[in-house]
From Swiss-Prot:
Protein name (Swiss-Prot/TrEMBL): ATP-dependent Clp protease ATP-binding subunit ClpX
HAMAP family in the record: ClpX
Family matches, as PROSITE patterns: CLPX_ZB
Lineage: Bacteria, Bacillati, Actinomycetota, Actinomycetes, Acidothermales
Binding locations of Zn(2+): 13, 16, 35, 38
Length: 427
């Protein structure tokens, strides 16, 4: 606290002890005083600490093979997509490492950004791939839905709201947000409604594609801090999108017909080989996708040009769905086993039960996303009863439980203890 000097009512700074005559300004608080020099010093310390914490570091950037191996721990299948994503992400952050799009001191080559387009049906892991990448690299990550976006000035969300989600994910640390990853889902829903340009304005289709162009390429965008529409009397957050990696995904229903028409029957003459539509399944067809197919689908050339990396994810078959249930680090079976373990009960699935769950997911057409819903339905009654019972040691889920809603097998605690004792005696 400031003290009075010998010469009268002379106030002193509570921090450095200088009198009001020795400083330019002395600011009073409730019982304390601070001088302008101490304020400047505090500002310097804070700015130094913030600049150190803000600067994202990519000194130990994992190699593409390491990125792919990390994805293998969480994502089953989709080898082509994982390889393409690993290379694209590595090149993107290597580009940031050497100074972004600026030219290096010993080279005149300018490194451009490579955004990614993921094509594939629902429930195949498009969103999960992007989430897992962001978690590995420890960068801010945001998911946006393209169906909610409209052109500026119309009812709906502006494209800048996507950037606000990323800033919020980075705790409003703009420097960190500028090296983050944004995943835009349902990108196929903003395709132009007709192949020919129309006189009527397409505010949720082509208009949104036009609005996204600059953000995808790299620009300094003005983002309203509270979201919503812009108005001239509000402050904006300035964010540079040059080093933000955009991954966009969509199911692109009907695109396979456009690809088939291009690669289908091209033969001419008696000796030409004709490739019928039956020769290729949907996964094979999508693997032949070209930018021209996306243009026919309704994406504008400028938009497709800003997504140089195009890769596909395939529908999950029965074997892949069973592996998803059991193999990843956070596999669904392990999650539910852990939940039961907290009630001191073992949960067991027979092989045919897992096959039945996978078959149900295929029938519903929901892919891996539907597995949890099926598991919840199967385990609902037993999860309701088990916490209130102390006599159950193990719950066994069989095929009949999944398909016919039969009660699961409950193994009493006494029999489990007796078996364990017999085993110990024989040993």
């Amino acid at each position: 606290m400031a003290r009075l000097g010998d010469g009268g009512d002379l106030l002193k700074c509570s921090f450095c002890g200088k009198s009001q005559k020795q400083v330019k300004k002395l600011i009073a608080g409730p019982g304390v005083y601070i001088c302008d020099e101490c304020i400047d010093l505090c500002n310097e310390i804070i700015e130094e600490e913030l600049s150190e914490s803000h600067e994202p570091k990519f000194d130990q950037l994992p190699k593409p093979r390491e990125i792919c191996e990390f994805l293998d721990q969480y994502v089953i299948g989709q080898e082509t997509a994982k390889k393409a994503l690993s290379v694209a992400v590595y090149n993107h952050y290597k580009r940031i490492q050497v100074g972004g799009s600026s030219r290096s001191s010993n080279d005149s080559v300018e490194l451009a950004k490579s955004n990614i387009l993921l094509i594939g049906p629902t429930g195949c892991g498009k969103t999960y791939l992007a989430q897992t990448l962001a978690r590995m690299l420890n960068v801010p990550f945001a998911i946006a839905d393209a169906t909610a976006l409209t052109e500026a000035g119309y009812v709906g969300e502006d494209v800048e709201n996507i950037l606000l989600k990323l800033i919020q994910a980075a705790d409003y640390d703009v420097k960190r947000a500028e090296t983050g990853i944004i995943y835009i889902d349902e990108i196929d829903k903003i395709a132009r409604k007709s192949e020919n340009p129309s006189i009527t304005r397409d505010v949720s289709g082509e208009g949104v594609q036009q609005a996204l162009l600059k953000i995808l390429e790299g620009t300094t965008a003005s983002v309203p801090p509270q979201g919503g529409r812009k108005h001239p009397h509000q402050e904006f957050i300035q964010i540079d999108t040059t080093n933000i990696l955009f991954i966009v995904g969509g199911a692109f229903a009907g695109l396979e017909k456009i690809i088939e028409a291009r690669i289908g029957k091209k033969g001419i003459g008696f000796t030409a080989t004709l490739h019928g539509k039956r020769d290729l399944n949907t996964a094979d067809i999508f693997s032949h996708v070209m930018p021209e197919d996306l243009l026919k689908y309704g994406m504008i050339p400028e938009f497709v040009g800003r997504l140089p990396v195009i890769t596909t994810v395939t529908s999950l078959d029965r074997e892949a769905l069973i592996r998803i249930l059991t193999e990843p680090k956070n596999a669904l079976v392990r999650q539910y086993q852990r939940l039961f373990e907290l009630d001191s009960v073992d949960l067991e699935f027979t092989d045919d039960a897992l096959e039945a769950i996978a078959d149900q997911a295929i029938l519903r057409g929901t892919g891996a996303r539907g597995l949890r819903a099926i598991m919840e339905e199967v385990l609902l009654s037993v999860m309701y009863d088990i916490p209130s019972r102390t006599d159950v040691a193990r719950v066994v889920i069989t095929r009949d439980v999944v398909l016919n809603n039969v009660n699961p097998t409950l193994v009493p605690r006494d029999s489990v203890v007796a078996k364990r004792e017999r085993r110990e005696k024989t040993a």
